[in-house]
A protein has these predicted regions:
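N-terminal membrane-targeting/pre-transmembrane regions
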Residues: 1-41
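Acidic, Ser/Thr-rich low-complexity segments on the non-lumenal side of membrane proteins
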Residues: 87-127
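A membrane-cytosol interface segment of integral membrane proteins
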Residues: 118-157
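A composition-biased, non-transmembrane "mature-region" signal
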Residues: 1-13, 81-89, 93-94, 113, ...
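Short hydrophobic alpha-helical membrane-anchoring segments
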Residues: 36-44, 63-66
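Conserved beta-hairpin
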Residues: 60-101
């Protein structure tokens, strides 16, 4: 189910996992370099060229911000996987982050590259694979996530 984080429903956030620094730093530097090159190029162009450059630089800055955000929230009751943004009525002009909520007892496993999560009941037609952005988590965060899920599943039994 896609939802927004609500402490009353999901409990407190115990920890968050973001992308690995080995992914964040080069990606951020690439976007910063592209922004700098565009700005320098625009300085030698006509004034009207500043508008598309400003849009492109704004996009690059937003991507730098996004690459630093958490991709998974581990809460007391469920695992929340980052999905994107929605425009909610009453939220003004600011989008609200949306999460895929998955119960710990429904998680069966992950693909070997952590690009997919298998959920459901291990019966015929009872499993589903969901694409998840866990490929760029650090190895320690991946292990911590798997250990916590196994711990929660052990307590639920």
């Amino acid at each position: 189910m896609l939802t927004h984080y609500d402490e009353a429903v999901f409990g407190k956030i115990l920890w968050q996992a973001a992308r690995s620094k080995w992914w964040i730093v080069p990606t951020s530097l690439l976007y910063a370099l592209l922004s700098a090159v565009l700005i320098l190029y625009a300085m030698a162009q006509a004034w009207w060229f500043y508008i598309p450059v400003a849009i492109a630089v704004s996009f690059f800055l937003w991507r730098i911000y996004e690459v630093h955000q958490s991709v998974v929230l581990v809460t007391e009751k469920m695992l929340l996987v980052t999905n994107g943004y929605t425009w909610e009525k009453g939220a003004g002009y600011f989008p609200k982050r949306e999460y895929l909520a998955v119960s710990y007892k429904e998680i069966v496993g992950f693909s070997h590259r952590f690009t997919e999560m298998t959920v459901g009941e291990p019966t015929y037609g009872g499993l589903a694979q969901i694409s998840v952005p866990f490929a760029f988590l650090s190895p320690s965060d991946k292990q911590k996530l798997v250990s916590y899920i196994e711990e929660k599943q052990g307590n639920a039994s």
